[in-house]
Structures are given as structure tokens and as C-alpha cells.
Amino acid sequence: MVLTLCFHSDRDHHFLSTLPLAEIRRLAPGGFSVFVPEDLLPHLSPSPSCPTPPLPRELTWSAACNPTNFPHLFRHHRPPPPCTRLTPRPPPPTPAPPSASTLPRVFHGGAPPAAFQPAIDFLHNTIQKDTIASSIIAALNPSLTSSLTLYPYALPPRWPSALNQAGIPATSYGHQSHPHPIHKTIETHLLHEHWANRATLPSTVMFMKRSKFDKLRVSNAALVKSASNFLHLLNPILTARDADRYTHLPLPDTLPSTPLYFMHHSLMYFSPSQIAGLFLAAPFLERLYASLVLPAESTIGSHPFFPSLYRYRTTGEHLHYVLEGNPSSSYTQPLTATQWLTTSSITAGDLHLTVTVLESWFSVHSILITRGVRPLELPRDIISLPSPDAVLLPNPSAFDIPLRSRLVPRDVCESLFVYVRAVRTLRTTDPAGFIRTQSNKAEFDWVTAEAWDHLAQFALLTAPVRPNTYFLPLLSPLAVVRHWLFRKQRPIFATLTLLSASTAAAIPIAIARLRTHSVTQLTILGHHFTPPKILARLPVALKRLIPKRLLPHLPSHLRPPPSWSPVFTLTFSELPKARFLTFPISGQTHTLLRQLHVPAILFAPQRPSRPLIFAGLLIGTVPVLYGAYRWFVSRFDPQTVYNRYSDLLHRPTWHLTFEREPLSCFPTPFLPHPSSHPRRARRLPPLPPAPPLPPQPPPPPPPQPSPHPPLFPASIPSPPPRPSSPPPPATSPASTPALTPIPAPKTAPPLTFPSPTLVAEPDAPVTARPSPLPLAPSRPFSELYPGHYADHSGSFFLQQPLVASSVPYPALDCLLVSCSAASGIPKEDLWATLCHIFPPSDLVSDLGLSTNHLTALAFTYQWLVTLRSGELVQRHGLLSAPFAFEITHTPPVPPATVGHFALSAPLTPTSACLTGGAPSPVISGPKASASLPRARFGPRPEAPRPPLTPPGFTPITEPTPATSPFALAALRFRLNRQPLPIRQVHAYSIALPRAKNLVSNLKNGFDGLVSSLPASDRTNLLPLIQALDHTADFPPARPPVGLIHIAGFAGCGKSYPIQQLLATQTFRHFRVVTPTTELRHEWKRALKLEGPSSWRVSTWETALAKRASVLVIDEVYKLPRGYLDLALLADPTVEFVIILGDPLQGSYNPTNPDSSNHRLIPEEDHLRPFIDFYCLWTRRLPRLVADFFGVPTTNPTRGHLAFASLNTTQSPLLVPSDSMARALTAGGHRAITYAASQGSTYPAPVHIFLDRNSNLVTNHVALVALTRSRSGVHFRPRAQDLPRHPQHLFTAFYKYAIDLLAHEADPSKPRPTPVDVTLLFQQQLRGLTILRDPSFSRITGGATHAFLAHAPLFTNLHGLRPTTFPDNLPTAPTYLARSLPYHQTESYPTSALPHRVFPASTTDWSAADDHPRVNPTFVAETRLPLQSELAPTLPSQPEPSPTYHSPATFETVYPGVDGEALARTFLAATDPLELEIFFRNNWSNQFPFINRPDTVACNPLTLVAPTHNQKQDPTLLHASLAKRLRFRDSTAPYTITAKDQALGYILYHSLQRAYCRSPEPVPFDPVLFASCIAENDFAQLTSKTQATIQANAFRSDPDWRHTFVRIFSKTQHKVNENSLFTSWKACQTLALMHDYLILVLGPVKKYQRILDSRDRPAHLYIHAGQTPHQLSEWCQNHLTPSVHLANDYTAFDQSQHGEAVVLEAWKMRRASIPEPFITLHVHVKTNIECQFGPLTCMRITGEPGTYDDNTDYNLAILYTQYLLHRTPVLVSGDDSLVDRVPPMNPSWPALAPLFALKPKPETSPFGLFCGYFVGPAGAVRAPRALFAKLAIALEDGSLPEKIASYVAEFSVGQSLGDSLWSLIPPELVIYQSACFDLICRHASPQLKLALRLGEVPDWGSLLSQLKLRFLTRPLFALLDAHTRVMVRTHKAHLLPSGHALHPSTEPFY
């Protein structure tokens, strides 16, 4: 053994590391001291050779004693002591046993989280910590990844730790939502970790969904490292809900013969007798694993132990179980299921079963039922189940309380025990008050209210009870004896009482006998003593004393005997544990005394007289009675008293236990019989053989079963529903149960599955069921594959598989044969297509394929299929399909159940639901296909091939390359009967200068990405490039290679025929080079390259290190110049080259200015001699885009142009620059540049992002961006962002679409002229042969074809509408007409636009004259037009405010604080001059103190916070400019950069994500906008007096430029929580803007605020327009008792740059604000100036919508920085609060440097928002700031005028009652009490009434006046002062009618 330690010996200091113990003892012969864990003590025991003293259990070490080898690994959280010499300690005389505090800490459930934390903290160096942390992360990463994969569900906050304690490794990082995530997590653990490990033998699963069963098989196969042991799935369909849950398949007569069964969440529905019937029905069954969902505490009460997990209630004999508060997930089960927890074994005749509870997870229990009884099995035992940490309070003395009402938390009970004894003066309400602070905690939600009440009463009544413990020194032996006698006084007194009683009873009798007898011998303890002679003569003396005359008269028995023989003896008899002195006697007394073990007396034969006996007993009862009195009156002995005290007050921990006993029953049938004639399993065609099972021990031979009941009885109790999806509890006759066997998959991956068989017929094959595949959510087929489907044939739902299915070809293939015969496509290819579209469950059916499969084939291959079945005619496929044919369906004839599809077959009538699958007759021969039309789409087989050379055509070839096998195969290749668009195979030789130029630039890092890669990634490429550079200097000789160049327009189909060519045998050794990773993925997907073959497709730099005989270069013009030559130089094995590209789409341009690659001839010029034809057609582009370029297209889609703000498609966002692409990608959007998208194809509309860089894009790159989509183009954000040059393709395409739209609306207008690409790109097309028809032939020899006529355009307007957006969006995107310039809208009628900009208003303005207008004669001239043209709108109907009921809260209890005394000491003695600054030779004056009242404290209390007043402080504004304003460098307008647009776009989407709404625009509401204008005019004009407006007439001065603002400072005293006791602060600047902007943009902001208020979700709180009471109510409903996050910012207003302007423009466009308003807003923000200079586009306080824009910007930043989801958030301007600390957005680290705004997150359990501390209890005004205001007002004498406002603020928290203390930090409690004290001192009685809880007393006069039945005090506080006085004095009847309903206009916050 090796130990790491540091010790001191007799010699020098030794610092040892990993020394053997023998070496340690040798170096320290004098002994040493070391602390070690307990498990190491046996190895360090003292020995004779090394007298080591006993070792403590902790290591003493020092951080100063370096170097050390982590000796702190043996300690537990103790600070290191100073380095001192340790001396050997002598061994103690008697080593004391280790106490609990010194023992090593024991951790359960894994290593302790902080066991090595001191070791990590000891590492001061960051590198050392990173080294340690890397190993920790490496160890944690697999476990965390596995846990997130297995348990991806988002769990409530405190449940991950609870599940971890239960052994379930769930984490708090789950992200998937679930109706009951905790139950789902437990179920997942049960299936994949608990059951999957126990299925070691062939097993059958019962009552489980098919998807869960498939996943369970995969988990078991991975664990057992072989084929899965789960072979059968048995799902009886017993209710209608089961039919929806389980697959409906027949069930055999007998159960599967597997030794293991697993019953999933159903045991509670079966009785032990039914389980016995199951074992009898399955004689091979040995073990049954069953899961039981049952709250064990249901046996003791109706309140659950885990209410957040489940709730239940009992009704009769049933238990209703609700999962996690979700009523939809509830179900009912029998209450008798608890017998499974109380049964240890089941006996049913000769059958013996053992029941074992394996594990319990809260309400889920794993039960094992085994056949037989084991030898060591206990018939009766006790089990413990999960329960809270609780104690059971005793019953009261007078009555009994239910057990559930006496269970309380142990921690609370113990804390309350200490609390009631620690309080000096305990009040009656103190225990209840303490409990109130604990009862609202989430961890105690299982405690009933009755239990809390019982605990409070118990603590109050037992508080005076104290233990009778005392401690005596016992300094003398006498004290020890007295103490012993005191402790044993009760048993000693009892013994003496009995002895005295027996002695007193025996004395009279003894005296009577001594008269006639003498004592001759005394025997004591076996020793004989001779008594003195006087005792022997005593009877004689007595006889002499008796007169002789009396002797005759004495009774005979009293007369002395004739002889004096001694008969009396005294003896001791020895008993088992005591010795007793006995006096033998006779008679009844002898029997009685013997039973009492008291001394007995032996007498002579003569009986004593009865009076003497009675006298003796009477004397003996005296001490007995006295002893009994003392026994019952005196206290118990101290030990008994303490034991009773401990039992009463120190209760042990309560555990939920069950006593289990055996159970005897009669077996009953397990399942009901489905019908009188059960269906047997039908034989199907055999499956391919599956891999054999691994060797396993054979199951025990089945016992000979005795006669048992049938498997299917006539009735059964309620079927077993699932807790995850519970069915209704009612029982019903069952449908046919389903046994779903699972075969082996088609392929053989490492985990293979055996092919199961049916038990009833072992040799019969079963229906093939493929292995489970990951599926997408179920959606309509028409949404997954959009198109115009005939007869709604695409409306069925489909779960699209994420990977292709591997289902074998079906036997019932008549539909495939019919479609193959019609189209000429092989039926195997058709089946492969269906495997890519449908999941395996939809491909396997006993009835064959259906019309759903026909629709999928028709969509894929562009068919319109007419299906005839009797009189029914249906069409399947697309209405626009170019090909059509007919199929007939023959319905089944009973008893057959399968129909038949065929071409031109006879018809019979049937229903609309058609299925068919009869084996089709083989259609072969020329007649079968010659008469059928053939489609031109889809893959075609290679054989039979056409002739090598068409007649009349001889290719021009070079001698060697052109006659190679590759050249011949390329010329021979046909796709859809069409050859490749080439004339010949060219010979190409390497151009060494081009290769040398490129390799030199690569080596120097001027081109490519190799130089920017990490060193570890470029180790393989750099040596290769250096070698190529050397090879280019001395090139080896090599012959020319064959080369073909396929060039054509975008989307003409250059790649697809080459991909089919590479699939042939000749071209199997190939590699493909792509310019981008995007194209690489498309090629891999098209070629189906996976695993080892994926190397064949790579990007251009990594391809230089690979070898293949065929080289394919895609998009060659996007690669550096000379790449073809360098590739041939790098790979001498290349024999044939295929290059693809379009010279029109631009060429490569180096980004490094030092690169010399641009000096070479461009590739389009270098490769032009090798272009045989240029294919000027397209298969990709929609007709709108193709017609614009004048290019024919085969795409029937019309296409559209739109301006949209949301990318709802899978296509990426195309941006002009790399920087914007990186910014948007970091924000979570898929973005690539225009040029990088070259070669890609997107089925959805492509989104082209426009900014100022779009003007710099050439037409070559613009062509790339416009030609990517199959369906249309979306520009974003608006048409004004299009390039200004009219010849730019973006602008030209927009103008073409506009003109086309106008022409279709009005045919009299000219049709727009398309762009002629042959003229636009004539430089690139010069000398090329252009083909305009894809159906060309080489017979023409490549002659130039004439231009084809343009295809006719559709005339409907729906062509401009996108068809790929889902229907669940609120509105469609902004289309073309939404962004038309206003000067152009005159020439195009509104009816021609797809959407109206202003919908037709339904308001009747004809009656506008009936409404009074405002007299505008006093309005300034600049305001007259807008004021006079708009008529006022009708007032909206006011919504009644919700009724507010006072909560039943406890009155607030305040500690006694003198507010005035606290005010005297509130301000520390500080020199005010130290708080000022010196600016421009002047001192500031924010803390004036001269001539200020100081009646309260030594200094004026106004010094607690800065005072901003420009009149008293001339330096205020100028000194604040540097912090409050940001200036532009010049007078030029601020330019919106690409970064601003990208960040604004990200912020906009984050804001919409916060509102949980679509970013798409909503229709404009002109009526609402008009009302906003009227409201704004009322606020700016009507509500003001004429004098005020005339005084401010300069604000409407026409000479005042509208972009100029006047900056002034805000006068205020900054008394708030963050400004108290601070020094000089910059003032807040306000901007005075032109009235034009206020009147024009003010209605826009009001309109946006109304729209936002409608969409705002409940978890989002905006403080605008809300009262503090509403804030408090929202907090009570949404906040949780957790740590809150406050995101503070540095210079919030000044840090908002261009991205804020872009965000505001996006918001206005979403609201469909007319474009002039948006343009005006952007113009003002980018051109703003003030008297100090030009300003940046920062936020200026005073501009319209300052608060709303600040709030939205803050909210957008929060949702960009964090993953908030539905977390409650409070936002108000730059103030924000998040309910709990959310996870960081993974993209934020990349986005944070791009923002000028710097967040400063702060976490605290006490959240401060807008001056209020908020929490789950509500909101309370920050007490310190409120106290400062009260104290300042008290000092300057203004308190009477302000106290009403302060009382209103204080009443918000006061209304919460005693719960407000949970919201205030402990250090501020004194200020809250001081505020209460000052208000009580100085407020009027009517104001104090607002501080009372509950309703105002029922004053009849007030209530009759207000027509209310009650009036809450918060509402009373809002009344004006006059009304409050009248109400208070009972004079409300004097108020005018309705006066009291108007709240006070005094500010209250």
C-alpha cells in the first residue's frame, strides 16, 4: 500500500510522496502524526519495532510546505494551518472510541460533489485548474450526454436532485416538454435501465406501445451485447382506447413460452388470483416483472406525499390518480391494488408464487413475482417505501387524530422545538407565526393544514416542559451513596414496604406461638445458630406469668403443650436471583405469601387462632396502604421521567412500512375471451433467416400443469391503462388482443435481433416488422410535400422517417406492378421510393398497399392517376402533373379480405377506402409495355443500352484519351434516352505555370483555408502542399487525360446525370471535388455515400491528398485558377476528368491582397475550348424567374416574389458578406453568402437579405442568388433596400415582377421584357454553342438551335403567393405590393395587388359631422393640417376592472423601531464637499447644505442622494455630457452597416420569440390608427390650455429643423435604492423635439403599444400602464421562490447604435406602418443633432416611444443572451428581472462582442424591480428609499403634502400582511418598521385606514352612495383626500353623485 503524506521526523523536514509505509516508519522511528481515513487505520497500526502512537483520522498539512503531492485529498473542508513542526504524542492510556464527528464522512449515491473541491481550490494557477478540470469534464461528459439522451425532458427545479437520490441519473438540462415529465423520466428508467438489464432470457412484454417496445429492444440488445431478448409483445385490446394505443392483430390460443414476462404499468388492475391464472396459463413462465403505479400513502390518508408529482382521491373502491397536476393525464384504478404491497407470497392450490418489491420510485414500484418459494424466503417481512423526512406527533390526551394529520417535517419540528424554548416571552401566536414561514415552502407541500395546526398547538402546550436533568459533582462517598439512594428510592421503598408488611403481619402470630414454644435453633443462610438460653426459657417465663387458675379457661389451642419441644426455626431460602428470609406457615396465608414471594413462617401442627390471623393481616396492610399511597403520589424515578419526556418531545423519524403476509386464493382467468370462436394466427410467407441467439442456459422444463382455467374467460376487471396516457377506467368487452412479434432487421448491424415465432404454431412464419426508426411529427402529406392535389388525395397524415426504411419487398405488390407497367420504372425502384417516404409501420400490412402509397408515388414521379372502383372515380396526384394513367381496383370477394390493383381490370362497387395487395400476375413481354405510356421522370435501368454511336454521327476523339473505357462509357451513357450534352471527349494536358502559381499561394497562406487551420489539423496538408510545390518545379511526364465539360445555366441538371454515370461499374473508382461543404453534403446525399466511402466527396483542399482514376470537379469556376492543373499534378492516377460549372455565375477572387492568383487567365477563358455545348434551360427555376431570364424551364411551378421577414423554410438566408453570415449564424440562423450558395438547390423559397453591400454585388453573384430555389424568391427586409442601379439583376427582377403583375391586372399595359442572358453575359458566352432544348441529339452535330418561344405565363394572381408556409402562422408574409414605392402606387390599381395596404374600413364616416370637433383656431399653423383632417373617433367601451377581494392574510407584525430616532442617525457625518466634483474651474452643487434645514439630523437629510437642479448647479449639464451623450464624428448621417442589420434582425426575432408570436406582418388597422391619432392630439392639444400651447409655440416653428433637438437636464432628487449614499452623479438628459415629430410619430408608437398589449403572453410583464398593486398581483401568480436574475447595463441609452434603429424599423413593418413613417423615423434617428453637436442614433429621452423602444430593446437583449422560453420576466425600460437564473444562449459568446451594450447580470433571492422588492408573495416598496423620502419630507416640512403618496406606496406591501417579510432583505427590516412608525405618527386617521387589511366597515351612507356592498382598503387609499375625509366622518351622503368613484389624481408611485 502507498500513502501520500507530509510529516516531520527527528531529522530535517521530509516531504514525501507515494512512499511505502515501511519507508515512512524507517524515516520516522520516533513516531509521527498523520490524519488518514478510517479505512487506512488497519495499515498504520503500531508495531513493536516502530512504536507509532494511535493515529487520528485527519491529515495535518500546510500550504506553505511546498512541494506537496495533494495531501489535502485526505482532509474534509478544513483551512490549512500554519506550517509547524509536529512532535510525537504519547499514546493515551485508554483510547476513546471514535465519535460520530471524527469518523470519515459517508456519501451515498456516488462520490460527493465537493470531496475534491479543496484540492481544486488549492491550485492557484489557472493552467493547473484547467488541467484538473479537463479530466473532470472528460469524466462527466459521457454520463451527461447519456443522461440527456435518455432523459431529455425538462424537469421542475427541485426534481432532478430528487430523482438522483432515487437512483435515476436525470439532469436539470432537459429541453423537451412533456405533459408529465417526471413520470416519463421514471418510466424511461424503469424500461431502459431497470428492465433492460433483467431480460437475460427470452421475454414477453405485455401492455406496451409498439414504439416503446422497439426502443426497449434496442436498449436490451446494447446491454446484453447480442440480439435482444424481448421477443414478443402482447397487447390485449380490452377497451376502445386500447384500440387506438395498440396494434390490432390476432392473439394465439396460448401464451408465448418464454420464461420471463414483463407487465408494463398494469399490475394495479389485476388481482393476485388473476396473476395466479396467468402462471397456470403459461407453464413456462418463471418470473413476472411488473410495474405498479400506486401511492403507498393512500392507505393512511388522501393527501399525497409528493403533490407536485401526483394527486389522488378515493371514491368507494377506486382511486383516481392525477399525474403532475394535468387533469387530462388522470385515470382510475382499483383501491385494492395496495394488496401487492402487503403480500409476500401467493398460494393457489399447488401453485406457489413469491412476491418481491425490487425498487420503488415514489409512486412507481417494480414488483417481481416468481414461481415457487425459495428456502430462505421469509413468510412474513416488512418493507419500507419512499416517504418524506417526517415525525409522527403523539395523539392528544382526550381523543385520536388520523395518522396523516400528525405527520410533520422533522426539520421544522426540531427547529420549532428549539424556537419555543429560545423565545424569552412566548406568545400564543409565536408557534403559528414560525410555522407560517415554513408552510409555504415547496418542499413541505405534502403536509396537511391539520398537521400544521396540530404541530403549532403541540409546540405551544409543551413549551414549558423541560427535562429533569442535573449534574452533581459527587465529591464524597457519602454523596455517591445518597445519589444512589435517590435514584433507587422507588424500588427500595417498595421492597421495604413489602418486608415491613410481612413482618408486621407475622409478629402477632409469632408472639402467640412463643407463649407455648421456645426457640432452640436459628438457621440463617445454611448456618445454624443456638439462641441464647434466655430465648429458650422465654416460653417458661411466660407460662409462669399466667395464673394457673386461668389455664383451664384458655382455649385448647392456646394451652401450652405437655412437653416443651422447640419447633420454631428461622431459615433463608435461595431463589434464582435473590435470597429471601422465609417463615413457613400453613393454610391460605401460606399460599398467598408464596405467590407474593414474601417470607413464610413454619408453625406447629396446631392452627393459630383466627382473631390473631386477622389482627396480623390488619397490621400488615398499614405499611402496604402507605406504600401504595406514596407510589401513586410521588414522581417517577429520574430515568423514567426522562424516558417519558424523550418519548413525548423527541419523536423518532417516521417511516412508511408495510407488513407483508402470505395470501391464499383461488386462481381466476387472466384475460377475457374475445369471442366464441377465437381467431388463430394466420401463416404468412417465411422471412429471411435471422442470426442465431447467443448461447443461453436452457429454461427449466415446464411442470406438468394441473387443470387450469382457460386463457380467455368470459369477464375480467378493468383493463390496465398507462399512467403516461391513461385510458378510461371502465371495463368493456375486448376486441381481439394483439401479439406483435418483432423480426430481425434486413441489414445486420452490430446489434441484431432474432426472428420470433408464434407460440401456437412454432413452425409458422409471422408478419415482418422492421426495427424502429426515428420519426418526425405526424403532419399532413400535403404539408410535407406541397402541391395542388386532386380530390384532396394528399390530406392523409404521415410520420416521415428521418432515415430510409429497410423493409423487404412485399409479396402483395399489385399496385407496384401496375404503376411500373404504366410508367416503365422498375417496381423495385418504386418500392425504394416508398421506403424513403413512409415509416415501416405504414409499409407492412396484411391488406397490401393502399391509395396513400399511390398518392406518394404520383407526387414523386409527377403523375395524375385516375382510380376506378365500381361507380367511384378518384384522382390521385398533382393536378399539374404532365402524365396521367388509370388504374382499376377490384374489391375483395368474401371470404377474401384483400383487393387487387390492375390496369384496365373489371370493376365492382365498393367504398372509398381502397386497399389492395393480391399477388399480381407477371406482366412481361413487349405487349405488356408497348401499349402503356411511359413517364420521363425517375431513375431508369441501364440495360438495355442504346447503340454506342447514333446513326450518322461520328464523334471527334483524340487517339488515346477519347478511346479509353471511360470515354466510351461517357459517350454511350443515356439518361431517359438522352445522352450527355457533350460532342466529344477532349484530351487535356497539365498547364504547369497555373499549378505552380496556385501551389505557391497555398504554401504561403495567400489562398485557401489551410493557413488558418489549427496546427493539429494542417499537419497532413502542409507537407503535401510543400511536396506539390517541389513537384511543380520538377514535374514528371504524364500523358493527357480525357476530359468532358458540362456547362449550363443554373439548374439545368448538370450534376444529376453525372451522379447516375458514377453509379455505373466503369466509373466506380471516382472522387468528387466541391468548392463548399454545402455542396459536399448534397453530393454525399445524392450518391448515398456513408461510412468508409464518404472520402470520395471532399472539398478542394483536402481532395489534393486523395487518389482515384475518375476526377469530378463541380462548380469549377468557383475554385482558384489553376486548380484543375494542380489536382492532376497531385494525383498521377487520374485517367478521366469531368468538370461541371456555369461560366455565367462568376469566378474565384482571392481575398488576400498578396495573392497572385488573379494574374492568371480566368477559368472561363481557360476552359472555354473544352465546352461543347452551353445548356440554356433549367429544370429548377419556377416560371416567374425563368421567364425573367428568358430561359425555358420544365418546372411547372409558377413561382413568386415576396418581401418577407420570417424564414419559415429549410433554405438558408443568403447574405452579401461573410461578416453578416457569421453574425447571423451566431444568432441561430442558417446564413451563407450569395456566392457560397452556388450549386445548391432549395425546394422552398430562397431568402435574399438586402443591405448596402448588395449594391456592390455583381450580376454574376446576383444570378447565383436568384437561381437557387424551385419555388420563388423572398427579398428582405423591404424594396427600398434594393440596389439603386436599374441594371442590377435584383432591381430588374423586382421591376419585371411589378410590371408583370400590372400587365396581368390590366392587359392593356405592355408585357415586361425579360432579360436576355446571352447579351447580359455575352463576354462569357462568346464562341459557345447554345442548346435551348433538353431533348437534343448528337445527330445535329452541335449546330446552334434557335431560341424557343417563351412559355405562356399564368394569369392568376396566386402565382405570387408562397405555397410552402404552414397554415398555423397568423398572417402571410409581406408580398410584393406591401413595399411598392408610393410614387408608383398611382399607376397600378389597388385591385391588382395581392394584398391591400389599407383594408377597406367598415366605419361609417358619413356621420362624422354629428360628433363635435375641436376648435383648432388656437393651434399653431404647422399643426392645423393633421388636426383638421382627422375626425374624432368614437370612444371605446371601457372594460370593467376586475373585482379585488382582500386576501385572508395575517396582519403584519412590526418590531418596535422609532422612525424619528433612526432618521437622526440615518446620515453619517460626511463633508458634502467631498462628494462634489471640480469641473471647468467650478465646483458642482449636487449636495447643497448651506441654508438648509437640519432639524432631524446634524446635516440636512437631502445629502443622502444627489440633487439635480441646473439653476443651482451651472456645471450639471456640461459635466454630464460625456456620460449621457454620444456624438458622431461629422455632420454626415449615421450609416446603417451590415453588422447593424444583422444584429437588428437577430434582436427582432428574439423580441418576437419573447412575445411567442410570428415575426410576420399583421394587417394594418386604419380605424385603430385613426383613434391613436385622435388620442395623441387630445394629449398634445385638447387637454392643454390655449395659453400653454401658445407659450410653447416655438416648438412648432417652421424654421426649426425637425432633426434638431434641444438637450436640457432633468430636475430631480435621485432618492432611490441605488443612489443612496453615493457621490456625484451625471444628470439625466431630456430632449425637446419638434412638435411635428410628436404629432406624426406619436400615434405610431401608441398603435404599436396596443398591438403589443394584445399579443403579450402572461409570463411577460411590462410595467407601463400598470399600478403597483397589479405588479404585486402578477408576482404572486408567476414568480417562484428562487434566485432572481437582474440584468443591469452600462450606459443603456448611449449603447444603442444602428441595430436599435433596424429593430425599430422591423417592429414598424410588422405592424404594417406605412413606409413614409418608417422612413421618417430612420431619417430622424440617423440625422439627429443637438446644440452640442451631431449625435449618434442613441436613445434620446423625449423622442416618441422612448419607453416602449427601450423596453423592447431590453427584452430582445434578454432573449438573445439567455434561453428563457416561458420563464417569467419583468421589463420596464432599462430595468429587468428574470424569475430564475436561465441557461446562457450558446450563441451569446459570439454575439456579445458585436454589441456596444454590456450587460451586468446580478443574482439575488430578493429581486428589486422599479423600486419594489418582488417575489412570490407580491411586491413591497423598497423600504430604505421610502424611509429616506419620509425623513427628508419630515425635515423640510413638506410631509403633510406628500404623505398621501407615501402611504399609497407603503400600502402595496402592507396589503400582503405578514408575508411581506419574505420579500425584504434582513438588513432592511429596520427601515420597513421605521416607515410604519413615521406613517403612524404623522398620517391622518383616514390615511391610516389604508394600512388595515380587509374591507372597510359597512358604512351605510358610503355603500349606498357608491352602490357597493364592500370597499377594500387599497381602493379606499386611491380615493381623493376630500372623499376619504367624508367617508371617515360618515358624511358620504354629502358627496355629489358618483364623486367617490373617481380615484385620486395624487401620484402614488
Curated annotation (Swiss-Prot):
Domain annotation (+)RNA virus helicase ATP-binding: ranges: 1017-1175
Keywords: ATP-binding, Host-virus interaction, Hydrolase, Methyltransferase, Modulation of host ubiquitin pathway by viral deubiquitinase, Modulation of host ubiquitin pathway by virus, Multifunctional enzyme, Nucleotide-binding, Nucleotidyltransferase, Protease, RNA-directed RNA polymerase, Thiol protease, Transferase, Viral RNA replication
Positions bearing the site annotation: Cleavage: P909, T910, G1342, A1343
One record GO biological process: viral RNA genome replication
Pfam families: Peptidase_C21, RdRP_2, Salyut, Viral_helicase1, Vmethyltransf
Family annotation (InterPro entries): (+)RNA_virus_helicase_core_dom (IPR027351), Alphavirus-like_MT_dom (IPR002588), DNA/RNA_pol_sf (IPR043502), P-loop_NTPase (IPR027417), Peptidase_C21 (IPR008043), RNA-dep_RNA_pol_alsuvir (IPR001788), RNA-dir_pol_PSvirus (IPR007094), Salyut_dom (IPR043629)
Binding residues for ATP: G1048, F1049, A1050, G1051, C1052, G1053, K1054, S1055
GO molecular function, one term: mRNA methyltransferase activity
Location of region: Disordered: 77-103, 674-773, 924-948
Residues covered by the RdRp catalytic domain: 1682-1788
The UniProt record lists the keyword Disulfide bond: no
PROSITE patterns, per database record: ALPHAVIRUS_MT, PEPTIDASE_C21, PSRV_HELICASE, RDRP_SSRNA_POS
Domain (+)RNA virus helicase C-terminal as annotated: residue spans: 1176-1308
The Alphavirus-like MT domain, residue ranges: 171-341
Record domain Peptidase C21: where: 762-922
Active site: C814 (for protease activity), H900 (for protease activity)
Enzyme Commission number: 2.1.1.-, 3.4.22.-, 3.6.4.-, 2.7.7.48
Recorded superkingdom: Viruses
The record's account of how the chain is modified after translation: Specific enzymatic cleavages by the host yield mature proteins.
Segments of skewed composition (Pro residues): 80-98, 685-731, 740-753
Family of this protein: Belongs to the Tymoviridae non-structural replication polyprotein family.
Protein name per its UniProtKB record: Non-structural replication polyprotein
